[in-house]
Amino acid sequence: MRKLASIILFLAILSNSFGQSKNSPLQISHLTGDFYVYKTFHDYKGNLISANALYLVTDKGVVLFDAPWDQTQFQPLLDSIKARHDKEVIMCFATHSHDDRAGGLNFYRKKGIKTYTIKATDQILKEKNEKRAEFVISNDTTFTVGQHTFQVYYPGKGHAPDNIVVWFDKEKVLYGGCFIKSAEAKDLGYLGDADVKEWEKSIKIVQSKFENPQYIITGHDDWKDITSLKHTLHLVQKYNAGKISTKK
């Protein structure tokens, strides 16, 4: 009887993980190989906005790149990963200090998950009296976790003064977070902490350093069109030329 109850519980978790609809608060999509994109949602000024993030399954455990924007999904994400892959999350990187990226640092740190930011992000969180990561890393750091290697890199200011990208050279996956706008974006979105003039320089650095990406994951909206980095550069150039306005 106890074994049957365990099976029923496991199937319930699986159903919650895989039975996703477009209305699910947590949506997980397979990208390629051991890479998965997950999407959560947040009510921003009366509009429900999606946020994309990434996780990587390794032999040692799962690595998260950014936390859910919806704090009610912090634990369901861990549960879904456990049900789908039978692995624990062991590391979490925040790609800048905004809530849609760093909001889960404290939750995951309390779970015993190693959390990481660069120094600039740590300083911003400290100044705002917000919870910080356990580990502070340099602006260009390469990690090997299990069978995978990835590079965490700060290209310069852009959407935020501390935005980083993550590059997986073997698979040619570029995780851009909010540094890269969706190819369907009409403007640059929130610019409260942005440096749009420097953003153009930073994009060109990324284009030069990480050539021929096969997958590019944007911070919001549709991420499947890999012209997103070029499109972001186009939006930035239009903004700097005074030909485009944006939200504040």
Predicted regions and their residues:
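Divalent metal-coordination and catalytic microenvironments
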Residues: 34, 56, 66, 81, ...
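Metallo-beta-lactamase
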Residues: 22-31, 61-62, 69-70, 116-227, ...
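Conserved beta-strand hairpin/beta-sheet module of binuclear metal-dependent hydrolase folds
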Residues: 30-77, 165-178
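Accessory terminal helices/loops
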Residues: 14-25, 197-248
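Structural recognition of the beta-strand scaffold that forms the well-ordered cores
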Residues: 37-39, 55, 63-65, 90-94, ...
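Sec-dependent N-terminal signal peptides
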Residues: 4-13
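Active-site metal-binding motif and surrounding structural segment of the metallo-beta-lactamase
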Residues: 59-61, 72-116
